[in-house]
């Protein structure tokens, strides 16, 4: 792609990368796809190579049946899926609703987009925000000691001054 002056990579992931469902291996693998895509986007942007990833929601044999319904209901009961997400998970559209998102991201219409994690499920299209750390404490390591466990506990509990 570099030799041809650019191009577009569109990878597939899953909402499972959030770690809410799918065991441990599947979410870890999908998180790796997302991280790889973001790294490619950063590394190859100057060469006009774009990389984005789609987390499609589409009805498959794995997203139907009584076991699946029970699993989704359990995730909702445990607070891992809100009511809207649960309903969307139980009434998933066919794959042809996600397909245009792939086509768009591969096209020149999306030439300004790279490093995006996009959700496409039925009529829903969304963009995951970039993950950045929220500062909860800072001290200069040149003239301050390391944080104590008690100080860290207070920061994470929102009690730090």
Model-identified regions with their sequence ranges:
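Catalytic loop of short-chain dehydrogenase/reductase
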Residues: 2, 10-32, 37-46, 55-91, ...
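Short helix-to-coil "ATP-lid" hinge immediately C-terminal to the conserved N-box Asn in the Bergerat
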Residues: 2-3, 111
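Short, small/polar-rich loop/turn modules that mediate ligand/substrate recognition or access, typified
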Residues: 45, 50, 113-115
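Conserved beta-strand scaffold in the Rossmann-like NAD(H)/NADP(H)-binding core
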Residues: 53-55, 117
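C-terminal helical subdomain
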Residues: 75-161
């Amino acid at each position: 792609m570099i030799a041809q002056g650019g191009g577009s990579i569109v990878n597939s992931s899953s909402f499972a990368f959030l770690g809410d469902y799918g065991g441990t291996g599947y979410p870890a693998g999908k998180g790796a796809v997302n991280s790889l895509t973001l790294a490619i986007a950063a590394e190859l942007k100057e060469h006009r190579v774009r990389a984005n990833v789609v987390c499609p929601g589409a009805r498959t044999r794995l997203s139907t049946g009584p076991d699946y319904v029970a699993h989704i209901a359990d995730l909702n009961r445990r607070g891992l899926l809100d009511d809207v997400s649960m309903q969307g998970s139980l009434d998933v559209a066919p794959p042809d609703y996600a397909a245009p998102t792939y086509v768009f991201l591969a096209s020149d219409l999306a030439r300004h987009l790279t490093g995006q994690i996009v959700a496409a499920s039925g009529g829903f299209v969304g963009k995951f925000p970039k993950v950045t750390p929220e500062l909860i404490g800072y001290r200069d390591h040149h003239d301050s000691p390391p944080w104590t466990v008690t100080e860290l506990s207070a920061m994470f509990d929102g009690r730090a001054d």
